[in-house]
């Protein structure tokens, strides 16, 4: 600690208000969450007991038509046809956004490996996992596109009927054409940012409990946006927002992966209402790797224009973002390419800038924000 600074205690930190005259700047504030966590007293979603445990049956193929789903007698199964729910519909009212819908559970077709098709529930997590292994799904496999190059080829299969280009944004400053054309030197560069998974220490998890007295549901889940989660789920399932409470307890890492609405959470709330009981789901590591939201996977074609002293004076960019099969809620699939467009000039005094940024759908896991 630097000489002259003062470390604020928890009580002092709580007393810093707009009218108190105290300021945050120049004060070393102690972390308030550490004592409970280092003593093993954290409160995590997976710690909550439940009557029923859920396991999702996921697609083993990237693209295919669902022909048949069957399960042995005694396996309690929820399919898309059983859900009284609207699809997830993120909206963006600019940048040539094409609205695409994500079903809560896949019906008719699957669009990426790991897409949830059905939900099995049982008395224990182990029983649910065993039961899910006995669910049989027959597919008619379809051609798949795995990257932006495949998706933009003239004869490419379309992930959605609207086409594979979901966002097409363009930005050019007024000085660009003149400055770029007059520059004496140019350098071209191709850059690829590979696909990533946040791999948080705690995977995604949800616990939904029905209160028989009030008819309300409490959803405890590993979300970074409890308020938007409540609004979206109530809207999708068609009941009053006041009938749903969403709690975000201690979360073992979010990094943006837990900032988007998970279809699995909607299934948990639906089941809690139908069973009028408590249900729980904890994602395993394999599920998280294949079906937890991914990030990055961008290709950038850059051309910089320089003056005689080697100073960059103009930049041209073409950004292609592989955004996967669906558009994440609430930020939409435009978040990655549009952030790249906004941040590419970086700290440079660069007033001549032109960029095209596209979000391209493929038969891969959906992209979401990542720090």
Give, region by region, the residue ranges found by the protein language model.
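Flexible, low-hydrophobicity surface segments
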Residues: 2-165
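Glycine-rich loop/linker segments at domain edges
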Residues: 33-35, 94-96, 100, 165-206, ...
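Short coil/turn connectors at secondary-structure junctions
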Residues: 50-53, 73-75, 107, 114-117, ...
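Alpha-helical support elements that line or immediately flank enzyme active sites
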Residues: 56-83, 117-138, 206-275, 332-343, ...
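Beta-strand segments within the central parallel beta-sheet cores of soluble alpha/beta enzyme folds
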Residues: 80, 243-249, 276-286, 313-318, ...
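Acidic, glycine-rich active-site loops and adjacent beta-strand->loop/helix elements
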Residues: 83, 223-226, 250-254, 283-293, ...
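Short acidic, glycine/serine/threonine-rich loops at helix termini
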Residues: 87-93, 131-134, 230-232, 255-261, ...
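Glycine-rich and small/hydrophobic secondary-structure elements
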Residues: 97-127, 257-308, 367-371
């Amino acid at each position: 600690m630097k000489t002259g600074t003062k470390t604020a205690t928890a009580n002092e930190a709580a007393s810093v208000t707009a009218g108190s005259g105290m300021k945050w700047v120049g004060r070393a504030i102690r972390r308030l969450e550490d004592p409970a966590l280092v003593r093993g007293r954290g409160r995590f979603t997976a710690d909550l007991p439940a009557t029923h445990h859920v396991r999702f049956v996921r697609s083993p193929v990237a693209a295919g038509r669902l022909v048949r789903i069957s399960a042995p007698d005694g396996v309690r199964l929820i399919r898309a046809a059983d859900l009284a729910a609207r699809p997830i519909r993120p909206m963006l009212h600019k940048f040539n956004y094409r609205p695409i819908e994500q079903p809560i559970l896949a019906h008719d077709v699957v669009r990426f490996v790991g897409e949830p098709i059905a939900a099995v529930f049982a008395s224990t997590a182990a029983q649910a996992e065993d039961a899910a292994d006995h669910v049989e799904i027959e597919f008619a496999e379809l051609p798949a596109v795995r990257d932006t190059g495949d998706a933009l080829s003239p004869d490419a299969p379309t992930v959605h009927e609207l086409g594979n280009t979901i966002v097409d944004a363009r930005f050019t400053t007024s000085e660009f054409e003149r400055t770029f054309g007059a520059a004496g030197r140019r350098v071209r560069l191709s850059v690829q940012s590979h696909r990533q998974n946040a791999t948080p220490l705690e995977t995604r998890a949800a616990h939904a409990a029905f209160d028989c007295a009030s008819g309300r549901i409490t959803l405890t889940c590993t979300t970074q946006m409890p308020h938007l989660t409540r609004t979206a789920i109530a809207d999708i399932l068609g009941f009053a927002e006041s009938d749903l409470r969403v709690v975000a307890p201690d979360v073992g890492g979010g990094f943006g992966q837990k900032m988007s609405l998970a279809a699995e959470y909607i299934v948990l709330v639906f089941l809690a209402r139908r069973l009028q009981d408590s249900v729980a789901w904890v994602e395993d590591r394999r599920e998280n790797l294949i079906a937890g939201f991914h990030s990055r996977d961008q290709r950038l074609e850059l051309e910089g224009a320089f003056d005689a002293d080697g100073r960059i004076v103009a930049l041209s960019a073409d950004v292609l973002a592989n955004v996967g099969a669906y558009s994440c809620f609430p930020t939409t699939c435009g978040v990655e390419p549009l952030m790249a467009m906004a941040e590419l000039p970086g700290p440079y005094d660069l007033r001549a800038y032109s960029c095209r940024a596209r979000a391209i759908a493929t038969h891969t896991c959906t992209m979401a924000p990542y720090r």
